[in-house]
Amino acid sequence: MIVVGLIVGQPLLVCGQTGNEALVAPPDDWSQFRGTPALTGVSSAQVPQNLELLWTFDAGESIDSSAAIVDGTVYIGTYLGELIAVDLETGKPKWRYQASEDAGIGESSPAVGHGLVFVGDLAGQLHAVASDTGDGVWTFQTEGEIKSSPVVVGEHVLVGSYDGYLYSLSATDGALIWKYETLNYIHATPAVADGVAYFGGCDEVFRGVRVADGVEVFNLSAGAYTAASPAVIGNRVYFGTFDNEVLGLDLLSQEVLWRYEHHTRHFPFYSSALNVDGKVIIGGRDRMVHAIDEQTGEEVWTFMTGARVDSSPAAADGRVYVGSGDGRLYVLDLETGEKIWDFDTAAPLFASPAIADGKVVIGSQDGVLYCFG
């Protein structure tokens, strides 16, 4: 492990709070991938039980990037390399920013903070763009593709790259604070809790790195390639692997508490976990959504879709929202897994839902952004 950069000694704030308080996204905002830096995927918004399609926006190219929603504006990236701001109420575009002429924005999802929108592209650049005007403010070049989503923690912006480094940059000017070296690609987005960034990688190691100075404080073999981002709550962390397992780890003892694998369907987990009401809920490439008891690792329920589920589920008001490669957005009962509602977009959904202001927003592979409410 190599750490390069400055040591920043000021206290960390996560969404204006310390410790593990910021586990649920506020009702009106979904400021980054999975809603909060802890990546729990939970919103406090009240969403209508019977959803209706409010509007669509044609972005012109496929959308793998998951939306951020702040102050009534939706931010989304596309494979054309554009970062687009769209009005949440009307679906009308506010501005477009061209991130790269040569490479698109893949799965890196925007994060909003300090009046800026941060997003990575497949040319390896992290972009900071003024949230109100769409003007570029700064860029930072890495040596590999960025599919990881940026996370804003106080004055730090964290992002992983396919060059094997986790970077911490100054939110205001993009200056390098530190970088932490792993042994392979970093695809996952780091989850931050109690001042530590937790993430897995393609080197089969799950790590915790202190945000203040980039020093490693947690290291445990995951036993498999990990593309999924973790969810952290309390002293537990949950994530899926390409060895067809979901793991529950104890952050204090640095031990694996349980491993979940479906008894008949043995497929990788690319989706990032949702952690809510004692359940870990995750999509699988076996076409299923799995709900797992967070204490025991035992199956609670499963729901079968028509194709792989790479979309990461989100929850609000007792319901689970998730997209599938079959083109449908599903709404499931959190307790039973029974289908409440679905909508056929007619194109695969690999992006993840964003929930804010009573609305659910998701992009599709045919470049259409959908808003339901």
Residue ranges and their predicted role:
Residues 87-91, 130-134, 170-173, 210-214, ...:
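Short loop/turn segments that connect beta-strands within beta-propeller blades
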Residues 24-27, 34-37, 55-68, 93-114, ...:
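Extracytoplasmic beta-rich repeat domains
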Residues 79-81, 86-88:
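Beta-propeller domains
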Residues 42-60:
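A short helix->beta-strand "capping" segment at the edge of beta-propeller domains
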Residues 1-11:
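Bacterial N-terminal signal peptides
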Residues 9-48:
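Sequence/structural signature of beta-propeller modules
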